[in-house]
Every structure is written in structure tokens, then in C-alpha cells.
């Protein structure tokens, strides 16, 4: 077997409207059409996609001291300071990467961990 590309990450959410605000407005991802019947939303990030899937009983882990060591989605950002300010403006907590590199972690409204890294 040869894996040739990464296609998408599926993220469980409990409130689609709230999550669409986070991924579409706060993170600025481009929403794309989807033809599936179950509730959700798809976002395009370059050649990659983020699939929000509604799962009303999705478990969350709010222990932010270990965000970087938990499963997470990482996005590259052009300016980390602007990204941090945007998250804070929308009242999302941030945690600097313990590695010392230019990156922060936050959580979406359902507790899914998001890394923003300046490349």
C-alpha cells in the first residue's frame, strides 16, 4: 500500500451553527458544498478538507495543559500574532506551544484541539 495524499479530517461537533462560526468566521476557512444528507459542513483548506460532522454526544477534554499532546488539527498561518488576536477577540483560549516554536493551541466550541503554527 502507498498512501499518496491526505484528504480530510472529520471533526465531531455538537452545535453545527456554533462550529460553522468558529471554522468559517474565526479561522476564515472557505465553506464548500456537500451533497450528503446527514448534518455537517465541509471546508476547503488548500488541497485539504475539514469535515464537520454533527454528533450530539461528542466527548470533550478541556484539560488545556495537554492540548499539544492530544489528537489535533494543525493549520499553518502567515502571522501568528494576528491569529492569536483573532482567537482572543472571539473569546477562544490560547496556549503557547511547549516546544518553543511559533505555534499556539486552542479548542473549537466542542473541545476539538486546533493548532495554529506560523510557517
Question: Which residues are covered by each model-predicted region?
Answer:
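Core segments of cupin and vicinal oxygen chelate
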Residues: 11-50
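Mid-chain, well-packed structural core segment of small domains
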Residues: 66-87
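N-terminal beta-strand motif that seeds the catalytic metal site of vicinal oxygen chelate
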Residues: 1-18, 71-75
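Short acidic/glycine-enriched loop/turn segments that link adjacent beta-strands
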Residues: 37-39, 69, 99-102
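Vicinal oxygen chelate
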Residues: 2, 84, 88-119
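A short, acidic/glycine-rich surface segment
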Residues: 57-63
Amino acid at each position: 500500500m502507498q498512501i499518496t495524499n491526505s484528504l480530510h479530517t472529520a471533526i465531531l461537533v455538537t452545535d453545527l451553527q456554533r462550529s460553522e462560526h468558529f471554522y468559517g468566521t474565526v479561522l476564515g476557512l472557505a465553506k464548500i458544498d456537500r451533497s450528503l444528507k446527514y448534518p455537517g459542513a465541509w471546508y476547503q483548506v488548500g488541497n485539504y478538507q475539514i469535515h464537520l460532522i454533527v454528533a450530539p454526544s461528542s466527548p470533550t477534554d478541556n484539560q488545556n495543559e495537554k492540548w499539544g499532546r492530544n489528537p489535533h488539527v494543525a493549520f499553518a498561518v502567515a502571522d501568528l500574532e494576528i491569529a492569536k488576536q483573532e482567537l482572543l477577540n472571539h473569546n477562544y483560549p490560547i496556549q503557547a506551544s511547549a516546544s518553543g516554536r511559533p505555534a499556539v493551541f486552542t479548542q473549537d466550541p466542542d473541545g476539538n484541539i486546533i493548532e495554529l503554527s506560523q510557517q
